[in-house]
Curated annotation (Swiss-Prot):
Belongs to the bacterial solute-binding protein 5 family. The gene is dppE. This is Dipeptide-binding protein DppE. Coiled coil: none annotated. It is found in: Cell membrane. A lipid is attached at C23 (N-palmitoyl cysteine). The keyword Cell membrane applies. It comes from Bacillus subtilis (strain 168). Disruption phenotype: A null mutation abolishes the ability of a proline auxotroph to grow in a medium containing the dipeptide Pro-Gly as sole proline source. Keywords: Cell membrane, Lipoprotein, Membrane, Palmitate, Peptide transport, Protein transport, Signal, Sporulation, Transport.
Length: 543
């Protein structure tokens, strides 16, 4: 039987993550015969696949899976998600919380070190968090700093840096005051956006994060080689405070975006983990070396409400109702995903003990006849005799192409609508989507911390994750209220109202909720894949 790990009931821990999946890569990445060298030297070397070139190793800038997966292993925050996916002491050895649950005081470990030998100080955290919020920095993850009192005002240009309530009281004491109590803040600070930055290094070389020979980290591993668009090598860090826990000597990350090539490399021993290609899922999913782990997040499509014809709500809803999520997961992706009929994924427990998704139910379902009615109504409202030309854009990757083709065919069959497909390389795609250059595009979302609000805040007006042009004052107010509501029952009610409004106005089409399906070398143990968060190799071992 396959190894299936169900992790939701353990209480999700925070982590970060937005993860639009990547596109192109060098398919020869990592094929250098280094495996044989590792065997003869007796080194424990883990071979994994990052799929694509990281966007950036500058903590608040990367803000995607291909950057933060490796970064989570070469840097570390005040807390780290443990094997049970709950936050545990990391750079901070302890902390205390005020009676009003708004002020946290963290004590930095005396033996916390950077890879260059400098001590990690409370000042490095104060510097990093204010750097993340600096409006001149333009960090997409800056909204995560809005938990801090004065953070949003500073980032929006309405406040001053000195008014951001995070202060290094001395080298080992960091004090931070929140806008409102947040029960999940200890998980938030495990997020890569909250990683420290060595102030002296950053001021001496503002591009310290761009190359392996200038990178300065503080995690279990140190970055030793970065062959751009090819591979990343990291080695066990001798300066890490908990180095005795780290069993691996090296980790080599390939950059191979094609899932079939990824699988072939696993079969030939060039990778220790691999994805399961959809076309092989029927024969592979029942193997003993397959791990299936729940993961928060979903695959979906975005409409640009500023481009015709998607300024019309009824036309958007018609497209959304024409999509059959069950067909896609059964016949296209074929990796045991759950169809998504709302935006917030399963795995978040309410005060009444129910799962948020179970309580909220299915908010949109395939309905061809209703979709046709809505399309006709929308076209009349816009005085369309014929819809404007429609292009669906996706990032260049076989998996994205297959889903886009299925959507294209479904819209043709159900609504008689012709949709043109277009694709582009990952980094260009990402920048153009942020700039609202697409009419209709593929997307994905991983929550930044383990709470439904992490999903829902993404569609507030002006949020860097919105990328649809959609704005709704009522929705913004519901999110603001939920973020500041102390009563959990009321808070969850506000979040349900917000999700219903989002799905009803349809700036998006949910497709499926994520899981993590991996083949894994049976000699490898201890890789931790968090339902909310990034792969953690601190505890990994290889016989």
């Amino acid at each position: 039987m396959k190894r299936v790990k169900k992790l939701w009931g353990m209480g999700l821990a925070l982590g970060l993550s937005f993860a639009l999946m990547g596109c192109t890569a060098n398919e020869q990445a990592g094929k250098e015969g280094s495996h044989d060298k590792a065997k003869t030297s007796g080194e424990k070397v883990l071979y994994v696949n990052n799929e694509n070139e990281p966007t950036s190793f500058d903590p608040p800038i990367g803000f995607n899976n291909v950057s933060w997966q490796p970064l989570n292993n070469i840097m570390e925050g005040l807390t780290r998600l443990g094997k049970d996916h709950e936050p545990e002491p990391a750079m901070a050895e302890k902390w205390s919380v005020s009676k009003d649950n708004k002020t946290y005081t963290f004590t930095i470990r005396e033996n916390a070190k950077w890879t260059n030998g400098d001590p990690v100080t409370a000042g490095d955290f104060e510097y990093a968090w204010k750097r993340m919020l600096d409006p001149k920095k333009g960090a997409s993850s800056a909204f995560l700093g809005y938990f801090i009192e004065g953070g949003e005002a500073y980032n929006s240009g309405k406040g001053k840096k000195d008014d951001v309530k995070v202060t290094a009281k001395d080298d080992r004491t960091l004090e931070v005051t929140l806008e409102a109590p947040q029960k999940y803040f200890l998980s938030v600070v495990s997020n890569p956006a909250y990683f420290p930055v060595n102030e002296k290094v950053d001021k001496d070389n503002p591009k310290w994060f761009a190359e392996s020979d200038t990178f300065v980290g503080n995690g279990p591993f140190k970055l030793t080689e970065w062959k751009h668009d090819d591979s990343i090598t990291m080695e066990k860090s001798d300066t890490y405070w908990d180095k005795d826990t780290v069993k691996l000597d090296k980790v080599k990350w390939a950059m191979v975006s094609d899932r079939n090539t990824d699988y072939q490399m696993f079969q030939s021993g060039e990778l220790d983990t691999a994805y399961v290609p959809a076309e092989l899922s029927d024969q592979l999913l029942d193997q003993d070396n397959v791990n299936i782990v729940d993961q928060a997040g979903l695959y979906f499509y975005r409409f640009n409400v500023n481009m015709e014809p998607f300024q019309n709500e009824n036309i958007r809803k018609a497209f959304a109702m024409a999509v059959d999520q069950e067909e896609i997961v059964k016949y296209v992706t074929k990796n045991n995903e759950k169809p998504a009929h709302a935006f917030v994924s399963p795995g978040f427990t309410q005060p009444d003990g129910k799962d948020f998704r179970e309580a909220g139910g299915d908010l949109i379902k395939p309905n061809e006849s209703k979709a046709k009615q809505l399309l006709e109504k929308g076209m009349k409202e816009e005085n369309y005799n014929k819809l404007p030309a429609i292009t669906l854009t996706y990032s260049t990757k076989p998996e994205h192409k297959k889903i886009a083709e299925a959507i294209q065919q479904k819209l043709k069959n159900s609504l008689g609508v012709d949709v043109k497909l277009a694709n582009m390389e990952w980094n260009v795609f990402l920048e153009d989507q942020k700039a609202l250059k697409f009419q209709f595009s593929q997307s994905s979302f991983l929550p930044d911390y383990a709470d439904p609000i992490s999903f829902l805040e993404a569609f507030q007006t002006g949020n860097s994750m919105n990328r649809t042009g959609w704005a709704n004052k009522e929705y913004d107010q519901l999110i603001k209220q939920a973020k500041n509501e102390a009563d959990e029952k009321t808070r969850f009610s506000l979040m349900h109202q917000a999700e219903e409004l989002l799905i009803n106005e349809a700036p998006i089409i949910p497709v499926y909720f994520y899981n993590q399906v991996h083949l894994q070398n049976e000699q490898v143990k201890g890789i931790v894949r968090h339902p909310v968060g990034y792969i953690d190799l601190k505890w990994a071992d290889k016989n």
